[in-house]
A protein has these predicted regions:
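Extended, charge-enriched "interface" segments that sit outside catalytic cores
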Residues: 1-81, 85
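Glycine-rich flavin
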Residues: 71-149
Length: 149
């Protein structure tokens, strides 16, 4: 079983960069949400462990589902039926797997059911997904538009 996160040591290295301490503390508002949300980290090590575990899940889904569907998705493509776009079967399967795993809204605040991830681990997740299927990453990656809105 392929995992597009655990097989790439460069990605794991990024999480341990010294600036991540400052970035995470800022994003987590000095870990002030730890009493409000059950899954909010209590300190940097807890946050870093969370990012690592989530990226491992993204890597597993990307390596075993998204990459496996990529060829057929390209062959099938999306369809326009009754003025509605219908994704290729594999695209829908990819998206459903990431939704089921809670990987939509990664960078959104917890109050909007997001994971409150800093941009660095979110971009790392996008790199992992794009390795499996760059076209699908375009669809999955639109989730950060919610921050702009």
């Amino acid at each position: 079983m392929a995992n597009f996160y655990t097989d790439n040591k460069d990605l794991k290295f990024r999480l341990s960069h010294p600036l991540m301490h400052k970035i995470v503390a800022l994003k987590e508002n000095n870990f002030s949400e730890k009493d409000k949300w059950e899954y909010a980290p209590i300190d940097f090590e807890d946050a870093s462990d969370c990012y690592d575990k989530v990226l491992e899940i993204v890597g597993d889904i990307s390596g075993n589902i998204v990459a496996a569907n990529a060829h057929d998705v390209d062959k099938e493509g999306p369809l326009l039926e009754n003025n509605e776009v219908k994704y290729a079967r594999g695209t829908q399967e990819n998206y459903d797997a990431l939704v089921k795993a809670g990987m939509i809204g990664m960078s959104l605040p917890r109050k909007y059911d997001g994971l409150n991830f800093p941009l660095m681990p979110y971009v790392m997740a996008a790199e992992i997904v794009s390795r499996a299927d760059a076209g699908f990453c375009n669809i999955w990656g639109l989730q950060d538009c919610a921050e702009t809105i």
